[in-house]
Amino acid sequence: MAKDDVIEVEGTVLETLPNAMFKVELENGHVVLAHVSGKIRMNFIRILPGDKVTVELSPYDLNRGRITYRFK
């Protein structure tokens, strides 16, 4: 998938799930299932409920995403 095809939105982590998955509520109110991107995992960045994050969504499946950034 090309980088141009992704939709980037901001959201808040609602809960932590097993296998590094998270429930994230987007700014528009939708709740999506998101996993952590490789760069965040490599740098041991902790993501906790309540954190504000940037999520990349595929135009093909808007219910799943990838967390690419955690705001400080």
Swiss-Prot record:
Q: Which CDD domains match?
A: S1_IF1
Q: Which SUPFAM superfamilies match?
A: Nucleic acid-binding proteins
Key word Membrane present: no
What GO molecular-function term can you cite, just one? rRNA binding
Please provide the record's keywords in A-Z order. Answer: Cytoplasm, Initiation factor, Phosphoprotein, Protein biosynthesis, RNA-binding, rRNA-binding
Q: Which residues form the S1-like domain?
A: 1-72
What is this protein's function per UniProt?
Answer: One of the essential components for the initiation of protein synthesis. Stabilizes the binding of IF-2 and IF-3 on the 30S subunit to which N-formylmethionyl-tRNA(fMet) subsequently binds. Helps modulate mRNA selection, yielding the 30S pre-initiation complex (PIC). Upon addition of the 50S ribosomal subunit IF-1, IF-2 and IF-3 are released leaving the mature 70S translation initiation complex.
**Name of the protein this chain belongs to:** Translation initiation factor IF-1
Write down the species. Answer: Bacillus cereus (strain ATCC 14579 / DSM 31 / CCUG 7414 / JCM 2152 / NBRC 15305 / NCIMB 9373 / NCTC 2599 / NRRL B-3711)
Q: What is the lineage of its organism?
A: Bacteria, Bacillati, Bacillota, Bacilli, Bacillales
Q: Which gene encodes it?
A: infA
